[in-house]
């Protein structure tokens, strides 16, 4: 139940509050026509999403300070869901890793796994990745 709860948290709540708005405003809108919702980024939406990232990062930090992985003693779909959303935000350079060492250490463990590395080789056209995105020891 905890795996499903946390996977839903990141796939629904984190996406709606953080990763979705950041990727939409900073990437998708520049490739969309005005009638499709394209145009300049909404800086208020970006600012709000960045604030929300901080709250979610603190939650991840709290979870992994009380358990080995997000949902318990072993890596699960919850870790993969959270890390996938965080990787999109990290790509854009919008994760304040210095604010939560426990969350940072957890993410470093996830992205160091061979099964996660293919995700880190994906690039967005015209948008360079942040310094921490591919660095396993950031």
Indicate residue ranges for each PLM-predicted region.
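Short loop/turn and capping residues at structural boundaries
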Residues: 18, 121-122
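Alpha-helical secondary-structure segments
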Residues: 1-6
């Amino acid at each position: 139940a905890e795996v499903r709860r946390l996977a839903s948290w990141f796939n629904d709540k984190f996406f709606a509050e953080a990763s979705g708005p950041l990727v939409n405003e900073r990437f998708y809108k520049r490739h969309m026509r005005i009638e499709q919702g394209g145009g300049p980024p909404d800086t208020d939406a970006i600012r709000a999403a960045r604030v929300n990232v901080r709250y979610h990062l603190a939650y991840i930090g709290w979870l992994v300070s009380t358990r080995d992985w997000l949902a318990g003693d072993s890596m699960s779909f919850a870790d993969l869901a959270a890390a996938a959303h965080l990787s999109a935000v990290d790509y854009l350079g919008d994760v304040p890793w210095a604010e939560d060492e426990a969350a940072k250490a957890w993410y470093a463990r996830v992205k160091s796994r061979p099964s996660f590395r293919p995700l880190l080789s994906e690039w967005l056209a015209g948008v360079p990745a942040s310094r921490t995105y591919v660095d396993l020891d950031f």
